[in-house]
Amino acid sequence: MACSTLPKSPKDKIDPRDLLIPLILFLSLKGARSAAPGSSPHQVYNITWEVTNGDRETVWAISGNHPLWTWWPVLTPDLCMLALSGPPHWGLEYQAPYSSPPGPPCCSGSSGSSAGCSRDCDEPLTSLTPRCNTAWNRLKLDQVTHKSSEGFYVCPGSHRPREAKSCGGPDSFYCASWGCETTGRVYWKPSSSWDYITVDNNLTTSQAVQVCKDNKWCNPLAIQFTNAGKQVTSWTTGHYWGLRLYVSGRDPGLTFGIRLRYQNLGPRVPIGPNPVLADQLSLPRPNPLPKPAKSPPASNSTPTLISPSPTPTQPPPAGTGDRLLNLVQGAYQALNLTNPDKTQECWLCLVSGPPYYEGVAVLGTYSNHTSAPANCSVASQHKLTLSEVTGRGLCIGTVPKTHQALCNTTLKIDKGSYYLVAPTGTTWACNTGLTPCLSATVLNRTTDYCVLVELWPRVTYHPPSYVYSQFEKSYRHKREPVSLTLALLLGGLTMGGIAAGVGTGTTALVATQQFQQLHAAVQDDLKEVEKSITNLEKSLTSLSEVVLQNRRGLDLLFLKEGGLCAALKEECCFYADHTGLVRDSMAKLRERLTQRQKLFESSQGWFEGLFNRSPWFTTLISTIMGPLIILLLILLFGPCILNRLVQFVKDRISVVQALVLTQQYHQLKPLEYEP
């Protein structure tokens, strides 16, 4: 900052009323916080806070595993690190980031005199311009930053208020005029209620002097995030500041930035063929037999056949059909173990439309971890909502009244930075989605609430009579039966002791293995469904291609066309009995329907069979039956009705004739005779 020898007053500040509008705008956006798009706020990422120089190169960084927007460490880069590849007056314009402290050391230090030293660090310091290229200059810089009459001040960059137009740009280190500074270590102690950071020294004067004498970076800063900075979610793009030394003459300065990096966000979707349909593998085909190769003919010998030795090949990845078959196979084994009467003969059906999974609320004991476990970093983007959870279980957080019916026990968590991990075979169903573990920091900072649930695939159980009746030619419409899902049949299996292997003996061990197979199949299918949803959300292809991304519907269509399942309404059904799951379910369905048809025909009489064997005869009879009945009624009751009608007409005619004759004659009065 260009400055005369006049004292610099801290009174020339920006009027606080000028900051009122930006402050209101900031408070209005304060609640607009979100985690990574499409992810759970409790998901743990590998977070890295980076401090950059004026060329946007990283010169210092710190990493940790935490949920987004919950970890705000103190950043401690050295002041000279910010000057690497920076302005020439710092003496480090040719030094790359992460370089060691350059220049000759002092001639005295903790290790004694050093060869090639430049000056004695113990001699009195002069008022030379502080630089970073030697140990002597870094010691002088330490004197400036710790002296009460000198120091440094920091001015915000692009995120400053619009009214601060006089603060300039990077050329003036965002400090072109007084009043632009918001933090620093100078005697007037600048401050701000809206800036994102505060900057101070991280070492005392005596500590810094000793480190400088040892030819190390000896001017570390302490950058702390303010409450306003902790509410901002734009750190991934970076924010920038300018720093200037408060010395006599022209104040030297530099610019630096702070940005956030986080990993484990999933694969990026390239522009091109849609990856959702890329792994639609067909059913495995048998490998062709190797062709015999003839050996070179030898003299006086017959040719011999030599079979080439098979070369080991890696098994192909599991296709969509195999994945869904594994899911149904695991469901069958778990059902056969717990309810063997249900698997005498049954059909297990996969639904083609969402939801593909349902949850059962359970009670369980979660584990408490001070550091994030490995499974907390697993991406959890499953679209299960609390409206699809049944039962009563363990709840955490502030549960609204509309969902308190799911809670048998509600726990309030204490403040702190720790993680709650769900027991094996369960997960947390929160109002933000599914997650294997919860962050106490996120729960205390938000209004999130969660329920401990078991996840069960939406596999529908049907008795054989219902399935066969849907494929038979029946003219009677029966009432739709109540569908039983796997969650209703096996709900509470995990916390009931089977998954944990409760008990001793073979039964408990087998039960654990059966459930683990189902659990593994569920996890594989959830990953594929999640991948399809992610690709669908990020797809840049045409609408017709997006419509084809109904992954589960396509998977079931492939199974149906391959004869592996029977299509029943919107479900793909597999036949199962005590021998196991039948892969060729369509052949089994045809066989059972043929058997039922023969049994039905054998129990019918010749008259009923006539109607079943001649469909045209049924149509003919139903067409002429009405006219024939009417004609028969006419023949039976027609003569009687006709006679009655004729007699009635005759009677009326006779009455009319009598009336006519009566009108032509007059009645004579009787004569009276006198005595």
UniProtKB/Swiss-Prot annotation:
Residues 548-564 are annotated as: Immunosuppression. A motif (CXXC) lies at residues 346-349. Pfam families: TLV_coat. Glycans are attached at residues 46, 202, 336, 368, 375, 408, 444. The keyword Signal applies. Specific enzymatic cleavages in vivo yield mature proteins. Envelope glycoproteins are synthesized as an inactive precursor that is N-glycosylated and processed likely by host cell furin or by a furin-like protease in the Golgi to yield the mature SU and TM proteins. The cleavage site between SU and TM requires the minimal sequence [KR]-X-[KR]-R. The R-peptide is released from the C-terminus of the cytoplasmic tail of the TM protein upon particle formation as a result of proteolytic cleavage by the viral protease. Cleavage of this peptide is required for TM to become fusogenic. Disulfide bonds join 80-132, 106-121, 107-117, 155-175, 167-180, 212-218, 346-349, 346-573, 376-430, 395-407, 437-450, 565-572. InterPro entries: FMuLV_rcpt-bd, TLV/ENV_coat_polyprotein. A lipid is attached at residue 640 (S-palmitoyl cysteine). Keywords: Cleavage on pair of basic residues, Coiled coil, Disulfide bond, Fusion of virus membrane with host cell membrane, Fusion of virus membrane with host membrane, Glycoprotein, Host cell membrane, Host membrane, Host-virus interaction, Lipoprotein, Membrane, Metal-binding, Palmitate, Signal, Transmembrane, Transmembrane helix, Viral attachment to host cell, Viral envelope protein, Viral penetration into host cytoplasm, Virion, Virus entry into host cell, Zinc. The chain crosses the membrane at residues 621-641. Residues 482-502 are annotated as: Fusion peptide. Zn(2+) binds at residues 89, 120. Residues 276-323 are annotated as: Disordered. Residues 296-308 have a biased composition (Low complexity). Residues 35-620 are extracellular. The surface protein (SU) attaches the virus to the host cell by binding to its receptor. This interaction triggers the refolding of the transmembrane protein (TM) and is thought to activate its fusogenic potential by unmasking its fusion peptide. Fusion occurs at the host cell plasma membrane. The transmembrane protein (TM) acts as a class I viral fusion protein. Under the current model, the protein has at least 3 conformational states: pre-fusion native state, pre-hairpin intermediate state, and post-fusion hairpin state. During viral and target cell membrane fusion, the coiled coil regions (heptad repeats) assume a trimer-of-hairpins structure, positioning the fusion peptide in close proximity to the C-terminal region of the ectodomain. The formation of this structure appears to drive apposition and subsequent fusion of viral and target cell membranes. This is Envelope glycoprotein. The lineage of its organism: Viruses, Riboviria, Pararnavirae, Artverviricota, Revtraviricetes.
